[in-house]
């Protein structure tokens, strides 16, 4: 007898029996322990046989299935059955009310349900889990509903359905009980929708099932009422929540296709979509479209279609806003980064010239242009610091006869490479600025000397001078210009060409205001006479300028 029983056990159960025998327990003692555990050995054998039967092997009768439910409902589930191996849910699990209710019923329908549950318990747990999961997806049933009815842990239920995580037999029995009753309840809904007018679903024949699975209690302390069954036991569990409507994959496909055609359909179009969606939902469940009212809470209505389209339009508008923010964000952040990282920050024209740190110059007028600064870094062995070349635009109002950029006014070349020509340093674009700025010009020292020689002493001019020491701004002292500018011009240029080949080129922007013994800001008598000029020089040449004596005092201020 024992040998025949071993042949019907699973591999794990055989290992457990072998371990018991290896521990010193004899067969007689083990058989006596089994008889003491269950006074009906034949009933115990039936349970083991039922666990190994194939789904089509045989159908258990009501009398054969009662001992199993008797064991499950009376807490004798400590001895593991098939599917209990390695259960990760170690919490104690009281007998769920759904099992107690099914055990207490003596109707023919309850007997059929118990037989179906026994058959599922005998199957492979993973196969049964996949079957239940597919049924839930087909009918858009959330896991929360199963948790509310069976009392299972939702995490454990999800792992069992998705990954086949082992689950105790008592818990699987509760899950299978819900599955069997849910199948019958949905089938009853569709059948009654065909027989009746389909307008109402809460008739007295199926009110108990609807209250069980689609309960909408208004009172928190009220239990589930089943008027048609006097022997039913009221489950003392928490209040069941109403099922939330969930769009099925078939309906979503139809709605998305309609959204591509029309984002805001009319009422007639929405009603046509309702019929199409309900038809697809019925076909998904394997029932006739004429039974659409049997969908229950999953029935598609015109209001739900309207809300779906409204939500899609909101989502699309939100995505467009995010895309616009992402597009304009980098440009804004780049401008902010350049304005903070650059040593020169643009300011309005209301600031005094000595404190202006702007690198963009503009002026009003139809024929005037502006330029934005381009900073070019030239590294060389003979240059210890980077060179910052500030570009300014020659104004259109400047008289062409001055010939400031003549061949004799070339940029001073240094060892390791010369500066790029003025044409490559100048970026001319249209002026759209509101404030007015004095036009500026890049020119070498020779050009400044040539113009300064021909200036009238009664006219006040502005000459910005570039000078820098080790890449940092320095405040410059006032420079005295000699009246014999023409005589010292050639000497200055000869000295500057020699020093530039030995010393590093140092450049910054400074303003040199020339005015006849007055502290007021200079005023131009005519803007076309001489606009501000840019002087490019080195330290020794600047010292030569400072040594000149003249009645024109030119204080240099760091820009």
Curated annotation (Swiss-Prot):
Residues 100-195 form the POU-specific atypical domain. It is found in: Nucleus. Residues 53-98, 334-384 are annotated as: Disordered. It comes from Danio rerio (Zebrafish). This is Hepatocyte nuclear factor 1-beta-A. Residues 85-94 have a biased composition (Acidic residues). Binds DNA as a dimer. Can form homodimer or heterodimer with HNF1-alpha. The lineage of its organism: Eukaryota, Metazoa, Chordata, Craniata, Vertebrata. During embryonic development, expressed dynamically in the developing hindbrain, kidney (pronephros), gut, liver and pancreas; expressed in both intermediate mesoderm (precursor to the kidney) and the caudal hindbrain (including rhombomeres r5 and r6) at 10 hpf with expression diminishing caudally by 14 hpf. Strongly expressed in adult kidney, gut, liver and swim bladder; weakly expressed in brain, eye, testis, ovary and heart. It comes from the Eukaryota. Transcription factor that binds to the inverted palindrome 5'-GTTAATNATTAAC-3'. Required for induction of rhombomere r5/r6 gene expression in the hindbrain. Belongs to the HNF1 homeobox family. Keywords: Activator, Developmental protein, DNA-binding, Homeobox, Nucleus, Transcription, Transcription regulation. Pfam families: HNF-1_N (PF04814), HNF-1B_C (PF04812).
């Amino acid at each position: 007898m024992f040998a025949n029983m071993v042949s019907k056990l699973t591999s794990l159960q055989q290992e457990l029996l072998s371990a018991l025998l290896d521990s010193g327990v004899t067969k007689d003692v083990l058989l006596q322990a089994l008889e003491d555990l269950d006074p009906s050995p034949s009933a115990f054998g039936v349970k083991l046989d039922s666990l190994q039967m194939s789904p089509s092997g045989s159908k258990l009768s009501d009398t054969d299935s009662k001992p199993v439910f008797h064991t499950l409902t009376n807490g004798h589930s400590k001895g593991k059955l098939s599917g209990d191996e390695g259960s990760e849910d170690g919490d104690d699990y009281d007998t769920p009310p759904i099992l107690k209710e099914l055990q207490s019923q003596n109707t023919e329908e309850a007997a059929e349900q118990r037989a179906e549950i026994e058959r599922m318990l005998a199957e492979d747990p993973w196969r049964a889990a996949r079957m239940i999961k597919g049924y839930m997806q087909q009918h858009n049933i959330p896991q929360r509903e199963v948790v509310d009815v069976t009392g299972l842990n939702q995490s454990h239920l999800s792992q069992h359905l998705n990954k086949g995580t082992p689950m105790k037999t008592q818990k699987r029995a509760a899950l299978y009980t819900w599955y069997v009753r849910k199948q019958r309840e949905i089938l009853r809904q569709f059948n009654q929708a065909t027989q009746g007018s389909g307008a109402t679903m809460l008739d007295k024949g199926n009110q108990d099932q609807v209250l069980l699975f689609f309960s909408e209690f208004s009172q928190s302390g009220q239990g589930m009422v089943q008027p048609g069954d006097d022997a039913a036991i009221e489950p003392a569990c928490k209040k069941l929540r109403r099922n939330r409507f969930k769009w099925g994959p078939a309906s979503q496909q139809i709605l998305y296709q309609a959204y591509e055609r029309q984002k805001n359909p009319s009422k007639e179009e929405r009603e046509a979509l309702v019929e199409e969606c309900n038809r697809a939902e019925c076909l998904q469940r394997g029932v006739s479209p004429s039974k659409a009212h049997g969908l229950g809470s999953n029935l598609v209505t015109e209001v739900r279609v309207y809300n779906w389209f409204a939500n899609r339009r909101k989502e699309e508008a939100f995505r467009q806003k995010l895309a616009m923010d992402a597009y304009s964000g980098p440009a804004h952040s780049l401008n902010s980064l350049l304005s903070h990282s650059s040593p020169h920050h643009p300011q309005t024209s209301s600031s005094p010239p000595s404190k202006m740190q702007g690198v963009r110059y503009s002026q009003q007028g139809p024929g005037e242009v502006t330029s934005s600064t381009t900073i070019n870094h030239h590294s060389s062995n003979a240059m210890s610091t980077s060179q910052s070349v500030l570009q300014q635009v020659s104004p259109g109002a400047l008289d062409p006869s001055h010939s400031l950029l003549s061949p004799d006014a070339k940029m001073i070349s240094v060892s390791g490479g010369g500066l790029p020509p003025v044409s490559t340093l100048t970026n001319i674009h249209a002026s759209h600025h509101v404030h007015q700025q004095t036009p500026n010009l890049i020119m070498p020292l020779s050009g400044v000397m040539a113009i300064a020689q021909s200036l009238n002493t009664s006219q006040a001019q502005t000459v910005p001078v570039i000078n820098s020491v080790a890449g940092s701004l320095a405040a410059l002292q006032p420079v005295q210009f000699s009246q014999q500018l023409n005589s010292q011009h050639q000497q200055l240029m000869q000295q500057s060409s020699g020093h530039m080949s030995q010393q590093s080129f140092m450049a910054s922007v400074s303003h040199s205001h020339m005015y006849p013994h007055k502290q007021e800001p200079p005023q131009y008598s005519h803007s076309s006479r001489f606009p501000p000029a840019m002087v490019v020089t080195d330290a020794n040449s600047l010292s030569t300028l400072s040594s000149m004596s003249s009645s024109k005092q030119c204080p240099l201020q760091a820009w």
